[in-house]
Every structure is written in C-alpha cells, then in structure tokens.
Amino acid sequence: MTTPTNYIATWFYKESKEDASFYPQAGKRGDSALVHSIYMQIQVPFFTTFRHYHPDDKLLFFSNLDQFPDYLERLFKELRIETVTLPYLCIPPKGWYGAWRNQFYLYDILRYMEKRMQADDTLLICDADCLCMRPLEQLFSDTRKYGSALYDASDRPDLSVNGITLKEMTDIYNDCYVEKEKREKEKEATKKTEAEKEEAEQQDTKNGVTRTELVHYYGGEFISLRGDVVARINEAYPTLWNYNLERFAANQPKLNEEAHFLSVVATRLNIHNNIANQYVKRLWTYPKYNTVEKGDEQLAVWHLPYEKKRGLYLLYKHFVNHPTFDDEEAFRKKASAYTGVPTVTFGKRIRDFITILLLKIKDKCIYLSLIHI
C-alpha cells in the first residue's frame, strides 16, 4: 500500500503591466519591481521554516515564471523545493476588482493537483507571508480524517471583506444555487407529464431550500484539503465561476476573490469546519490594528500580512545565504523580535522605521534607473 503524500505549496503570479492590480500591503501595483522583489524574498523564510519542520514532505512552488533570482534558485535546490510553472487560466476579466486580481490562480493550482494527488493525499496551500513554527503532522492527520481543514475568519458578519459582506455572499449562494435551480425546474416542468410532476414534487429538494444561515468566510491564506475533496471543489467550480461572470457583466455584487469562492463552494459541498483555526491565525501587527493576543506565539503557523516589508524581510536577510537553523528556541526569539508576535517592542518599531526607509530609497533608485533606460 502506498504511503499518502503531504504536499505543502505556495505560489506567486507575476502580473504584467496590462493585467496588474493593486497590492495593499506592498502599496504598489502587481507589475512593480518592488512588489516582485518583496514576494520573491518572503519565499526564503517561508520555505526555510516549512522545510525545517517537514523534512520528508513534498514542498511545491507554483508560478507563471520559469526563472528566479539566484538566491531563490540556490534555496530551491538546497531545500528540495519543486517548482511548477503554471499558466493563469482562471484569470478574471479586466475591471474585475481593484486588488489581488491574481488570487484565482489558486484554482489553476487545484486543477493541476487533482491530476497529481491520490484520494488520501493532503494538500496545504499557504500564503508565502507565513512562518511555520511547529510541525503540522496533526493538521495533515485531521485533513485526512475530515477531508479538509479550513480557516474560519467570519467573526464579524457585518464587515465588508474585500468588497462584499457575508449577507451578500449568502444572497449570491441562494441566487446561484437555489433560485437558479428553481427557474430551471420550472422550465423542465412545462415539458413533464402530470405523473412526472407529482413525482418531482415528492422528491427531497434539500439543495433547493433557501439558505438563511450566513455563509462562513474561509480565509484563502491557509487551505488544507484531501485529494478527493480537491476533485469535488474542481467539479463545483465552473458553475459558480460562470454565474459570477454573469453578475460581473450585469454590474451586480459578485465574489471578488478566491476566498469568497472557496466559502460559497464549501457551503455548496457541505464542507464546514474551523479546524485550521487551532494551527494558524491572521496576525496583524499594524500599529493601528493589532490582532495579536497572548498565546498566539504558540500557534504552528503565523500569518503575517503586515510584515512582508518588515519582519519577514529581516528574516529573508537572515536566511538567504544559510536557509536552515538548529536552535529552534533561538529562532523563535528572533522571529518574535522581528515580527512582533506576541509583542511589538520599541526595538521592533525602530527596526521597522529603518527597514521601510531603506526600501523606499531602493524603490526610488529602481524607478530612476528605469526612466533613464
């Protein structure tokens, strides 16, 4: 019997000038040289930490690029990272949404992995602005047992998340799956005999019942799926995608990003859990918005969206020429000091100020060099 494989993957899609969207944490468009360098650099602490705690699992990096900076090429070779060059076929049309137009690349990855995975394999797709701080064997065990481990981030149902609320997501779910099915059944009913109509009315129409409970918002930064569930999501994707395109054409509220899609598809497939919440948390360390609580430092994975140009950049500098560590406690202290988990110290604020200043100077130099070419 073949031993199931645990896959751990992250990705980067480089946008062209024509299809570039805005990246809020970087403060630039996706075709910016600064954005490109930031997302290349954070791969270093990501893969260094995930490989340390998972020496035997399969680590993958997906991109539309086939060449990378020399330091990344060396890292991939040393840490045994497989790179997969994948085109972006699930790209939404122009004018879709202001930010993160690259996010639907996730579904190209799922299509690819369906062909590669066995039913009992597991796949963790994780954003690259994450650090792995503990082994994830139990996560993979949970995924294998329950089919998925999702990060439920729907603690504020009234909040607009990337342009849409949970109430609007629920309305879209009902209109796509319930009202659309009703309309189709009404069309079919005109073609049926009286006996067929009576039989249809007696059938259990569970999926045709309007949903009143709000759809849960499952974050796209940390998704763990079993192989057979990957296949189910891929099968369900086209119906929702085509419906969403109809709403876009009609200028109606739509599902703007990959996590919106995941949330509605998961609801459709009756996949409901918050298993990943015990392993990961979105840890905002922004001075005006800090979500870090005491005890968060014990999580297996830290998701650090604000630290791309700060703590994660410093960890890139630390690991770039030597992507390994032996003393886990010493690394935890360094990661804590650089990222502000669990406490943003005065020393971190000073380091952040200097780091951002240097990055601004670097970005300005790149801009000046380009306009003189």
Locations of regions flagged by a protein language model:
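N-terminal anchoring/stem segment of glycosyltransferases
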Residues: 1-95, 118-119, 350-357, 361-370
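Long, low-complexity C-terminal extensions of enzymes
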Residues: 289-370
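Catalytic core and acceptor-binding pocket of nucleotide-sugar-dependent glycosyltransferases
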Residues: 181-191, 196, 201-305
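A short, glycine-/small-residue-rich helix N-cap motif at loop->alpha-helix starts
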Residues: 97-106
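Short, solvent-exposed loop/turn segments at secondary-structure junctions
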Residues: 12-17, 65-68, 91, 130-132, ...
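A short, conserved beta-to-alpha structural element at the edge of catalytic cores
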Residues: 149-178
